[in-house]
Amino acid sequence: MSHVRYAAPPAQGWDIHCHTVFSDGTETPGTLVEQARLLGLHGVAIADHDTTAGWREARAAARKAGLPLLLGTEITAVDDDVSVHMLAFRYDPANTRISDMFAGTRAARLRRTKRMVERLTEDYPITWDDVLDQVKEGERTTIGRPHIADALVAAGVYRTRSDAFADAVSAASKYYIPTPSPSTHEVIASVKDAGGVVVVAHAGDPRRNRRLLSDAQLNALIDDGLDGLEVWHRGNPPEQRERLLAIASRHDLLVTGGSDWHGKGKPNALGENLTDDDTVREIMRRGVDSGSRF
């Protein structure tokens, strides 16, 4: 039976792409859970960048609220110079292969962010300490460009984080430095080694790269064991949604949706794109009980 059940975003279900203060979101896991409950979502997932640091707090909040929770991570990757984000769910966080990969990516991201700030300080009134002031959970936070953007906002250079990302913090700016990242194939192998489920996030968003993942690149990931594609995301234009749905249907992939919520860090509204209950059940079935260690 095909896992492609909807040609349009489901009206009810789970938001399984959300960020908190443990990466580049502005709200705590507890606030995420409570807002999801108030919206009447069937469940929610925490998916901070390259970390599981917020899982324990999210699980405690979900138990208190009586809201189903999916534990996940948005993993930074690269595929032939295309920057790719991959959502991993229901994996063992104690798996050495995946935890070492996260540690390496976070360290590389920290070095890169410092180098970007060094470039920016030549033209803008910010320092590394100003950036650290925007980090809410210290060393447990995955630090990156959003924290630079927030420092620029605090300095009065820009009005919002989005404004900073449209200019000085943009991947097209002279200050930009890419983050050394594992390959998409390495990510899939690591997630599978940890017993998890892996989905390519916002694969059709043209604003994120000069070029998108090609059908051939996606087919290679499918051959490696890719589970699904995030189709329902505000960054995917209609023609890309149609393309991704066709690929998902052809290869019987899971089709997911998520808001990419960052609290006040982005205009994305919690619950604006959802994943249906049957798809979440299939993610649960395929993965391991990653919350049993918390």
Cite the ranges covered by each PLM segment.
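C-terminal regulatory/interaction regions
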Residues: L245-A246, G263, P267-N273, M284-F294
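A short alpha/beta connector and helix-capping loop motif
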Residues: L32-A36, L270-E282
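An N-terminally biased module of ancient metal coordination in phosphate/nucleic-acid-related enzymes
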Residues: M1-V82, V169-S170, P182-K266
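Extended substrate/RNA-proximal surfaces in nucleic-acid metabolism proteins
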Residues: S2-R5, A61-D215, N219, D278-M284, ...
